[in-house]
Swiss-Prot record:
It catalyses: cytidine(34) in tRNA(Ile2) + L-lysine + ATP = lysidine(34) in tRNA(Ile2) + AMP + diphosphate + H(+). The lineage of its organism: Bacteria, Pseudomonadati, Pseudomonadota, Gammaproteobacteria, Enterobacterales. This is tRNA(Ile)-lysidine synthase. One of its GO terms (biological process) is tRNA modification. It comes from Enterobacter sp. (strain 638). Ligates lysine onto the cytidine present at position 34 of the AUA codon-specific tRNA(Ile) that contains the anticodon CAU, in an ATP-dependent manner. Cytidine is converted to lysidine, thus changing the amino acid specificity of the tRNA from methionine to isoleucine. Belongs to the tRNA(Ile)-lysidine synthase family. It comes from the Bacteria. ATP binds at residues 21-26. Keywords: ATP-binding, Cytoplasm, Ligase, Nucleotide-binding, tRNA processing. NCBIfam families: lysidine_TilS_C, lysidine_TilS_N, PRK10660.1.
Length: 426
């Protein structure tokens, strides 16, 4: 790959952030970009290395990347991340953390460049096939995709690992080998170490053929997107929720295609056919008085008021009581924060009143703007607060008296003509 070819592959970007693990693939990519920059000095390249903390060698890898980038005069950002168990598996969780770090580091006018190659594409296709994916999943990885308001570019997607090895040998490049790449308990490693060598030995152009199939699937998916764009817009509310009633009159195939695209708009991992059926049967068609939910990664598909909602999963806070010792400063909560701000109708606490944030209230409540008393459940219903927000919305208490619900109501015991408001940042 000549400098002109790599320049064309990232055109029109001349400011690049390169995902740099220190392995063979990203080392070759960074080297080629460095050679291009030597010919065109206005090109700006930064590298980012993500330290996952999964290997005892991780600190050595950082030192290697720092040394190489220093010798090539390329600024290196090292991001240390901690993986949270969200039920995705180690591989998927590491990838998620990595791309969150990329997104955080990417600057305006800069494109993200990563080093996936043809063999990676083949593995991705086979993993999607193993999951029973449709055209969207079998499209595997595009050369370019939208990312964090810019683009993610994969210039090496048409090259084999063998060609990258030859480049590295020709230029005497040094790289690191992650020992976990030899662990065939991981699906991708199993394919790379055991399956693909056999397939390539039997059919030398298997990876190329797989890439063509992935491209054809991507074309079909793109065509479907074009054909369904207007219809999808007609069944999505202005707030991004999916209306159930018009979907009921559609064929299962058409309905599933629209649900998939609604989920894709929320950057959800594409569900299996079984999961799509469950979204429709268990969530959309659940009885009216039910509060159905289906967990997808760190999010949930919920139904409320005849619509499907895509919401971030939040554990219940119902039994928590959090003391607010100094209401003049922001109080950090397990999920967000609260503070007092000017311009509301909440009275400030008296010096002898203990201030707490809670998430449930018992008995009959009297709120401003409503005649008579009612229970909290009834108040939530009147204000159209979705069920999943009812036990996570902060309730302000002075002593044992409910004063206000953040952003929703003030009780008669807490109201004053010129007071403050309770701001909640979730």
């Amino acid at each position: 790959m000549t400098s002109s070819v790599i320049a064309q592959s990232v055109f029109p970007y001349r400011q690049l952030l390169v995902g740099f693990s220190g392995g063979l693939d990203s080392t070759v990519l960074l080297h080629r970009l460095m050679l291009w920059r030597e010919q065109e000095p206005d090109v700006q390249i930064r590298a980012i290395h993500v330290h996952h903390g999964l290997s005892s060698n991780a600190d050595h890898w950082v030192a290697h990347c720092e040394s190489l980038c220093k010798s090539w005069h390329i600024p290196l950002i090292v991001e240390r991340v901690k993986l949270r168990d969200e039920g995705l598996g180690t591989e998927a969780q590491a990838r998620k953390a990595r791309y969150l770090a990329f997104e955080k580091t990417l600057q305006a006018g800069e494109a993200l460049v990563t080093a996936q190659h043809l063999d990676d594409q083949c593995e991705t296709f086979l993993l999607a096939l193993k999951r029973g994916s449709g055209p969207a999943g079998l499209s595997a990885m595009p050369v370019r995709t939208e990312f964090a308001g810019s683009q993610l570019i994969r210039p090496l997607l048409g090259e084999t690992r063998t060609s990258l090895e030859k480049w590295a040998q020709d230029y005497n490049l040094c790289w690191i080998d992650d020992e976990s790449n030899q662990d065939d308990r991981y699906d991708r490693n199993f394919l790379r170490l055991r399956v693909l060598p056999l397939l390539s030995e039997r059919w030398p152009h298997f990876a190329d053929a797989t890439a063509r199939s992935a491209a054809l699937c991507a074309e079909q998916e793109s065509l479907l997107d074009e054909l369904l764009t207007e219809e999808l817009a007609s069944v999505i509310s202005t707030e991004g929720r999916l209306r159930i009633e018009p979907l009921e009159a559609m064929s299962p195939v058409r309905r599933a295609a629209l649900i998939r695209r609604w989920l894709a708009a929320h950057h959800a991992q594409m569900p299996s056919r079984t999961m799509l059926n469950r979204i429709w049967e268990e969530v959309a068609l659940a009885r009216e008085d039910a509060t159905p939910r289906l967990h997808l990664g760190g999010f949930e598909v919920r139904r409320y008021k005849g619509e499907l909602w895509w919401v971030k999963y939040q554990p219940t806070m119902i039994d928590q009581i959090i003391e607010w010792r100094d209401p003049s400063v922001t109080l950090m909560l397990p999920q967000g924060s609260v503070c007092f701000a000017d311009g509301g109708h909440i009275r400030l606490p008296n010096p002898d009143e203990q201030v707490t944030i809670r998430f449930k209230a018992c008995g009959i409540l009297h709120i401003v703007g409503r005649h008579g008393g009612r229970k909290l459940k009834k108040i939530w219903q009147e204000y159209n607060i979705p069920p999943w927000l009812r036990d996570t919305t902060p309730l302000l208490f002075y002593g044992e008296t409910l004063i206000a619900a953040a952003g929703v109501f003030v009780t008669k015991e807490g109201w004053i003509e010129k007071g403050v408001q309770l701001e909640w940042k979730a």
